[in-house]
Amino acid sequence: MFATAEFWILACLVAFFAILGYFKVHRTLAATLDKRAADIAAELDEARRLREEAQQLLASYQRKQREAMKEAEDIVAQAKVEAEQLAKETRANMEIQVERRTKLAEDKIAQAETQALNDVRATAAEVAVGAARRVIAAKVDAGKDAEFVEKSISELTSKLH
């Protein structure tokens, strides 16, 4: 029995554990493992705390982002309203300006028509006076009624103008 290798391996193993027990290595080993477990628990608590803090920060940033988006939408809506108002004002101003220019053009056309009519009348009067002068001069003796002819022509000119 003492000659087998298994016996001596068992004896050495028991002796090794006895020496470890005598030097109280199991307590040191347990204390080290307990310390390591406490460190791991502390790290887990710190990780939970950091996770909660990160979730709070994320929620805060998401809320701020929603507020910023809402504010941006409000700004865009206000800009659209202002742009529509400006477009309406511009359209109204353009219509007023077109009406003014149309009225001015119509006035100029009416004035040009009146001027053209007056020019035609003046030309017709001059032609009529010239024709009347020639007809009267041909029918009336030049010496006898020259004064009458001149008087009639001046009256005719003033009446035609």
Swiss-Prot record:
Main location: membrane
Keyword vocabulary terms for this entry: ATP synthesis, Cell inner membrane, Cell membrane, CF(0), Hydrogen ion transport, Ion transport, Membrane, Transmembrane, Transmembrane helix, Transport
Localization terms from the record: Cell inner membrane
Pfam families hit by this protein: ATP-synt_B
InterPro entries in UniProt: ATP_synth_b/b'su_bac/chlpt, ATP_synthase_B_chain
Topology in the lipid bilayer: Single-pass membrane protein
Alphabetized CDD domains for the sequence: ATP-synt_Fo_b (cd06503)
Gene Ontology cellular-component annotations: plasma membrane; proton-transporting ATP synthase complex
GO molecular function: proton-transporting ATP synthase activity, rotational mechanism; proton-transporting ATPase activity, rotational mechanism
Membrane-spanning segments: 1-21
UniProt subunit comment: F-type ATPases have 2 components, F(1) - the catalytic core - and F(0) - the membrane proton channel. F(1) has five subunits: alpha(3), beta(3), gamma(1), delta(1), epsilon(1). F(0) has three main subunits: a(1), b(2) and c(10-14). The alpha and beta chains form an alternating ring which encloses part of the gamma chain. F(1) is attached to F(0) by a central stalk formed by the gamma and epsilon chains, while a peripheral stalk is formed by the delta and b chains.
Family under the similarity heading: Belongs to the ATPase B chain family.
Function, as annotated: F(1)F(0) ATP synthase produces ATP from ADP in the presence of a proton or sodium gradient. F-type ATPases consist of two structural domains, F(1) containing the extramembraneous catalytic core and F(0) containing the membrane proton channel, linked together by a central stalk and a peripheral stalk. During catalysis, ATP synthesis in the catalytic domain of F(1) is coupled via a rotary mechanism of the central stalk subunits to proton translocation.
Protein name per Swiss-Prot or TrEMBL: ATP synthase subunit b 1
Species: Parvibaculum lavamentivorans (strain DS-1 / DSM 13023 / NCIMB 13966)
Source organism phylogeny: Bacteria, Pseudomonadati, Pseudomonadota, Alphaproteobacteria, Hyphomicrobiales
Gene: atpF1
